[in-house]
Structure formats: structure tokens, C-alpha cells
Amino acid sequence: MHEKYVPSDVESAAQGQWRAIDAYKTTEVTDKPKFYCVSMLPYPSGKLHMGHVRNYTINDVMYRYLRMNGYNVLMPMGWDAFGMPAENAAMANNVPPAKWTYDNIAYMKKQMQSMGLAIDWSREVATCSPDYYKWNQWLFLKMLEKGIAYKKTGTVNWDPVDQTVLANEQVIDGRGWRSGALVEKREIPMYYMRITQYADELLNDLEGLGWPERVKIMQQNWIGKSFGVNFGFPYEIDGEQKLLRVFTTRADTIMGVTFCAIAAEHPLATRLAKDKPELQAFIEECKRGGVAEADVATMEKKGMATGFTVTHPLTQEQVEVWIGNYVLMSYGEGAVMGVPAHDERDFAFVKKYGLPVRQVVAVEGKEFSTEAWQEWYGEKTGTLINSGKYDGLNYEQAVDRIAADLKELGLGDKQITWRLRDWGVSRQRYWGTPIPIIHCPTCGDVPVPEKDLPVVLPEDLVPDGTGNPLARSEAFVNCTCPTCGGAAKRETDTMDTFVDSSWYFYRYASPGAKTMVDERTDYWAPMDQYIGGIEHAILHLLYSRFWAKVMRDLGLIRFGEPAKNLLTQGMVLNETYYRENEAGKKTWYNPAEVTVSFDDKGRPVGAILNEDGQPVVLGGVEKMSKSKNNGVDPQLLIDQHGADTARLFVMFAAPPEQSLEWSGSGVEGASRFLRRVWSFSQANEAALRQGGTFDAAQLSDVEKVLRREIYSVLKQADFDYQRLQYNTVVSAAMKMLNALDSAKGARPAVLRETCSVMLRVLYPVVPHLTFQLWQELGYADELGSLLDAPWPKVDEKALEQSEIELVLQVNGKVRGAITVAKDASREAIEQLAAAHEMVAKFSEGKAPKKIVVVPGRLVNVVV
């Protein structure tokens, strides 16, 4: 073997062999247990980042460990290829999104292959391929037939200059990101999916999932099952008796209502603004605000009195009606009761507009003040006051009594509501799955016949930011009605890209199938392990769970959850550096452009920009991102140190679920360790290749210690592999190398046995180096390729010791150690301890009062 470790040569050779035998192509077999591990498919943005490297290495380590343990393992890969970033890049570069996307896929695939990942590329999926999105369209039509998909009007952000719909993130301070125009809210017809139909099941099935508790809680909160009361405030308008309906989880505070607020889109708001220009103007202002719940939570709360009142259902008092920009028509009834004494948002609203505050819940020992909000105001722990016949009741009692009274009056009743809303899947964008609907002036909306699927998206259009290019493509839009044969037009909306990512893992399992999925999906799915970032905890993971239940109900799959287990890997962090100009604008500099100075304790105290030698501000450690310019290009790392070093570093630096802080010295350390592994193998090549056999009863002390250390560490490493604690697995391999390095005089047969254990423990993390050494040292001739070499078994006899070492304490302080027979009696241990020279030294001639023995651990002499 070569004297020097050259990562590029080693990795090229290993990958060449794997390609030659199609090492990771996987089929369905019945004589092995299966394991299906999937990393969330990436968006083809152009280059891999360190977060990708970490995610895919975790998956790869899992794959290799399980394959060595006799599992039939599948690790596929694909591309979440539709979406708005491709359109933006296309505009910036004046190229079709398709070209930009396919070029990026080719480059990123090459990067993944350079990492040596155990991916079965025969199952590769790109969601922008007609062969894939045909099944988005097919399932959409099936859902339309079953009433799971339906059409209704929905509110969107409309840019009046660019004449296009904007996503929420494209609205900045109420203006279009590109045109700068004030954004309007518009009602347009869109398609929705009845995810609310599955709300109970989505909530209840969380319990059986091996997912992080944090993710489960986030989904529970998003689904948001609420027990409350739905009731109405009576009013009369235009000679008609009506009810202003609200839903509340705090019916106990109904006697504290001092106003009601309605959404700008509420029918009552429209009616009340009929002859009031000020109200009309305010309603238009509200409509220009964000349409997302997150926008409403952070925006300034504004309101305008309508001059109209409704009647309190229990007190008959007149209650003012306001229009509020924080009330969404799409949530609840589009109206809320205002109880400022016990709701923080209402409290802030009335402080701004001078409305009354009426306390109706008291907590013993706490004093209420209208001057400032206190957390306890909103708690359910008190009893009612200022509430007439309900005074003295606690929360549960009050809700029951008030709900019963409202029901008796015919004005309300208890109700379960959900925060979850149906999923709007229409997007007024070009680069997405075309919705398979034809609009006929005679027949109305006509589904595209199954035989005509897929409706193929033209790939040669270039967006210019003004409207949807599809709507301007006559070749796409103009068609024939499949029902009457007359001239018709295609739907130009495309599907939300979350549709694409809701089922790709089933298509991996059925590559080339003539149906959406086939029996191979039943073999592989559900996923045994899914790996991805916590940022996908709600939308992607919730939609994929919904999709599984729909596909199950349509008879396509036999299960209702996509993934048994979920690992949310931590973020990759790095230092940030910036300068700020007079206007407050920050310019961020990459760590590679900066030289940092440290104090005598190694803490950073300053930094300068290499280009001009002037100071930059230390911005602290943050997630690697383009916006903070603190990313590290994985390709540079691989080119300089090799893929194995990159893999070793990202596995060793932190447990998979925790954040990983980038460290240049850590990378150097990983590279240095791999060079040590190579050097040890090269220096001992002759002995390791010689091998032979040995009699365990005739081992030297050095050999006993070596085998005991190797198998003791193997036992822990095996446990750590099973619980996905790969950082401590790397520590185990380091301990093994230290033990081998220290075993001077050990015979070749013992060295060969123990080195084979180390190589196999290290292999899942560092596959190229270990694969090469396995061959160079002759292990492949004996045990077969390292790809399928048997996982080493712990030799329990090697762990047995005739003697053990106990910590020696005098008056509770460690003073040394004593070696005793493993089966030594308590009396023998006490005698040895009492006679030890360190006891004589620290007892000052005093006789021991007592000797405490903790079996297997320590002995404490008390004087």
C-alpha cells in the first residue's frame, strides 16, 4: 500500500468499484428484514450546503450499519424541482426555469456522488418530470371525484402593477417585492383539499409515531382542537333579525365583553360601509394587509368604529361593532368578541382606542389594574366576578352554565373547532404542476380525461414578473372541451409545491410503475426512518400525513402514516462578521475573508477584513445562510480534505439532533485522525496481512488488554449506532486506534482480529478509506467485501478480568488505587486498603474508624 494517504485517490478508486458493481441498487427480497431510510429531498438550488452534507451523511451511516447487520436497506434520492426560486432565477438570468433546474440537478447529483453516498440512483425522482407530476394530476382528479378536492373563492395578495398574485413572503411592508406597489387582497376562485376532514385522525395518530415530541406538539398546536362555545349577538338591519356569530374558548368571560370586532371582508362590514367613505377606505386598507395568520400576529392592530351596535345575548346591553385588521375572515366566523380584561390582544386594542375594560375573573391575592397587562389576566384559574348569577363559578362551571343558557335562548351551544384550515393548492405561478381542468363556456369546469394525462407544462417559457406566462401561452391555454368538443381553455393555475413533496417516497419505492404506485411500495413503505430539518415540522410533514391517509382511503397503500420514525437533524452554525453603514445597512463577510484575534483563553476578541485590514464586527454564531454569508462550500472541503474527512467531521462534531458549530480546527482534527488510521495500517501491513490464529488461553497481558479494550468499545459503539448517536461512535473508533497503537508486541493474529473490528466500526462513517484498507490488508479475501461484511460480534470472554482496579479514598478524597482479585471478599479488600501506603500517609497514624467498600468501584478509608 502507498505510504501516504491521498484522499482523492482512495475515494476515486472506491467509488469506481462501487459503480462497476452497482453496489447500491436495491431490490425487494423476502429473506431479509427491510429498512427504508429517506432524507427529505432537496430543492435544486445550485450547490449542496453543509446542511445537506450532514443530513445525507446521517442517512448513509444508517444505511451502511444496517446493511452490515443483514438488512435489505434502501436509500433513494430525488429533487423537489418546482417552485418560485426557479422562476426568480429564470428572470434574473433570462433562461427558462427548466434549464436552470436541470443544470442544477446535474451539478448537485455529481456533488452527492463525490460524497460516496449509498444512493440507489435507479429510483431517482424529479418532481418537474411529467412522468412524476402526471400522478399529482391523477390523484387530484380522484380527490375531486370523492369531494376531497373542491373549488371556492379564496383571498390572495395581488400586485396591481405586475398583475400577479404574490406569495406571503413576497409582500414586504405591504408592498410587492418587485414592483414596490401597495398590495391588495383579492378574492379569486381556487382549489382546496379537505385536510380538515382528517383533523381528528391527524391529531390522534401522532401518539403512535416515533417522532420528536417537539414536532408532535407543533403539529398538535397547528391542528388546534379547541373546545368552546359558538354563539350570536342579535342585531337588526334593513328590517331583518340576524346574529353576529363568534366562537370563543373563553365563554366564562362573556360578561366582560365591551366591543365586537369583525373582519374587513365580513358581510356586515360591507353593508355598514355602504354610505361611509371612511369605512370603505379603512376596509380597503385592511385588504392590503397580509393574508397569513403570521402576518396578522405581528402587524400593528388597527380598528375603526362602525357606529353600529349588536345586543349582548345575556345582558341585553348594546355592544359597539368595530372593523379590525387583525380579524381574519378565513378563521372562525370572521368576528370576535372583545374582552380586554382577559385577552392581551383586546387589551392592547382598547388601550389604543379608549374603550372600556370590565374585569370579570378574579384570582385570589392578585390585584387587577387597567394600566398594564399582566399574564394572570388571561389565565383560567380564577373565579367569576361582576357576572351576575355566574359570580363565584370557576372556569369549567361558568362555561357549562353559560353554554346551557345560550342554548336555551337559541343563541348558541358548545362546539369543537379546529385551527386547521383546508389546504389551498392553487398557485398563480408558472413553474408547477398544471391543474388538470378545462374551462368550457358550455360545460363549465371539465376534468381532463385520464387518458389525456399528463397535462404537460411547457418548459420553454421565461417569466418576466408580470402575470403568469402560462396564461399568455396560447399553445397551452387553447384546447378542445373533452365533453362537447367545443373551443375551451385550460386552467393556468398550478399546484402548491407541497403537493409534489407529499408522496415522492412512495414513487421511489415503485420506479417506472405504470400506476401511481404498485406492490413494491407495500414492501418498502412506510418509511422506517425519515430525516430532515425542524423547519418542515408543520406544513410538509402534516401534508404528507394527510396524503398518506387519502391514498390509503383510495386503496393505493395499506397504511395511514408516511414515516414510523423521524429524525430532525440540528442546524450547522458558523461565526458571522459584518460592517454597518450610516443608514444601518449591514454588509456580511464570509469567515474565510476575515482574520480573528483571540485572548489568552482562546476567546475571539476582534477581527479584521483581510482585504483592507480594517475591523469588522463579530456577529456571533448563527445558522449558515446566504443572507449572513457565513456558509462553507462543501465542494471546497471535499476537494481539499476528501469526502471522508467531511463526513467524519459532521458526524463527530455533535449528536445528529443537535446544532453543529463549524470548526476549521475540527476539520483538521478529522483529517489528522484518518491519516493516523492509514499510517497505522501501512506501518503494520505485513503483520496485519500475515494474521493467523491464536489461543485465547495463551494471550499476553498486552494482548488481553487490547482485546478487552476493543470489544468493550465495540459493545458501546454498537449501542450508539442503534440509538443514532454517531458522534460517540467516532469517539469509539478513536479509542480503538489508540488501543491498537499502544499494543506493542501483540502478535499479528491478535492485531489482525482487532484491526478488523476497528475498520468495520469506522466504515459506515468513513466508507472510502476503510473500504480501501479492507482490501489492501486482505480482509476482503476472508470476509468478503466490506459493503456486506458481517458486523463484528462482541467476544464476551475477552471482557472478563481476573483482577479489577478500585479507587482508593481516604476520608472521601481520592488518594490512589488498589488492584484486587475480581472475586475478592470485602474483608480482603479492607485489609489491602488499610495496609496501603497512601492510607498511612494521610491518616497521620490514626487507626481507621471504618472502611466503606463500593463493589467494583471504590474503597473509602475513614479515619
UniProtKB/Swiss-Prot annotation:
Main location: cytoplasm
Enzyme class: ligase
Entry annotated with the keyword Cell inner membrane: no
EC number: 6.1.1.4
Motif 'HIGH' region: chain residues: 42-52
Record carries keyword Protein biosynthesis: yes
Entry-linked Gene3D superfamilies: 2.20.28.290, 3.10.20.590, HUPs (3.40.50.620), Isoleucyl-tRNA Synthetase, Domain 1 (1.10.730.10), Valyl/Leucyl/Isoleucyl-tRNA synthetase, editing domain (3.90.740.10)
Domain of life of the native organism: Bacteria
Protein name from the UniProt record: Leucine--tRNA ligase
Binding site residues for ATP: K626
A Gene Ontology BP annotation from the UniProt entry: leucyl-tRNA aminoacylation
GO MF entries: aminoacyl-tRNA deacylase activity; ATP binding; leucine-tRNA ligase activity
Gene that produces this protein: leuS
Catalytic activity: tRNA(Leu) + L-leucine + ATP = L-leucyl-tRNA(Leu) + AMP + diphosphate
Coiled coil segments of this chain: none
Similarity remark: Belongs to the class-I aminoacyl-tRNA synthetase family.
